[in-house]
């Protein structure tokens, strides 16, 4: 089973989730993705399909992705870059492959960036020509928030093992976990709670059967003990 998620970085809240079988190719999820005009969609190169990427252009939306190593293209224009920022090139290109040029006939922007921290070179593709080249690299870096989202789900909502083996049982557990994440994220934002999502979830789980108002439980200044005991529980032996 695969879980494809569109994460809105303005609040780190999933706005689109598609559950598919493990054998389904990642790129097919783009057929189900609702495209919002003016929005940026950041994805890894497993989703590179030029016919599907061209849909973003026709819907007045933008994408940022990594180019595949065997990309066949011709350079139309090069712009100056400040190499002290890690940028190596900022080009306007046209796809040169017989099939790819037919599937995506419009120009693309190719940005090359060197990450000094990892000593790696990244080549990005986008259909946006107005934002700074460094912003293109920054947008792709923000894709890491999706990885953090899945890590949070696995660590805090216990999807390390499934309680059932049927398709319906697995999907139900996944949707419950995602719904819990969204509710906690909304709660944090609406109540302006200065705690991590993990801390909020832990407090809620420990005060689940109490009559304490949620806002009081989250802003009281008390935190669960490091061993996970309820901080409202009385001490059995007061020595």
Go through each PLM region and give its residues.
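Single, function-defining residue in the core of a domain
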Residues: 1-239
